[in-house]
């Protein structure tokens, strides 16, 4: 098996991170991998916001929990009410990925960038977790102000957030993969 396929096989969603920050070299390589993702018509309709400031991460975690509790969504309310719930798994780095709302394929392109981030991280020994739930961060007045303060451009909307950090423990086991989801037309 070649190195790329090995990285794909080993990548897991990590939900326990050590507190130490990833290196600048690792971060630069991971961000570069995002910028190299494919996009429809090479539009590159994305914006990446890298957050490592502990006070900002704490503020985002607090706001996410508050918005989940107010969401009216039974799953989110139950999850946010659980004292063991840690919104970003204590990851020391987050990459917020936003798409140009006018770009028809922006969400797909941002998803490709998120996968590049996760694979690059795994290849460097850095754990990652791609999350869509942080979108709820921006569904309040404080959330709109938060996006502004983070430098998210006007006309861009959250697609996903990638948590990054060193893994606090071994990779989780591979869950069983569905095998009846492929058909070939030859």
Predicted regions and their residues:
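Acidic, surface-exposed loops and disordered segments
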Residues: 1-186
């Amino acid at each position: 098996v070649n190195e790329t396929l090995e990285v794909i096989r080993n990548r897991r969603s990590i939900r326990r991170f050590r507190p130490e920050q990833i290196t600048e070299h690792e971060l630069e390589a991971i961000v570069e991998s995002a910028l190299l993702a494919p996009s429809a018509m090479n539009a590159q309709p994305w914006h990446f916001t890298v957050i490592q400031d502990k006070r900002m991460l704490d503020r985002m975690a607090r706001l996410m929990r508050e918005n989940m509790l107010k969401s009216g969504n039974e799953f989110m309310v139950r999850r946010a009410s659980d004292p063991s719930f840690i919104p970003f798994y204590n990851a020391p780095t987050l990459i917020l990925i936003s798409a140009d709302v006018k770009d028809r394929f922006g969400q797909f392109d941002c998803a490709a960038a998120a996968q590049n981030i996760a694979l690059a991280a795994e290849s460097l020994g850095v754990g990652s977790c791609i999350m869509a739930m942080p979108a709820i961060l921006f569904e309040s007045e404080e959330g709109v102000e938060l996006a502004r303060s983070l430098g998210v451009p006007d006309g861009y909307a959250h697609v996903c957030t990638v948590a990054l950090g060193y893994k606090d423990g071994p990779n989780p086991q591979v869950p069983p993969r569905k095998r009846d989801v492929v058909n070939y037309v030859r």
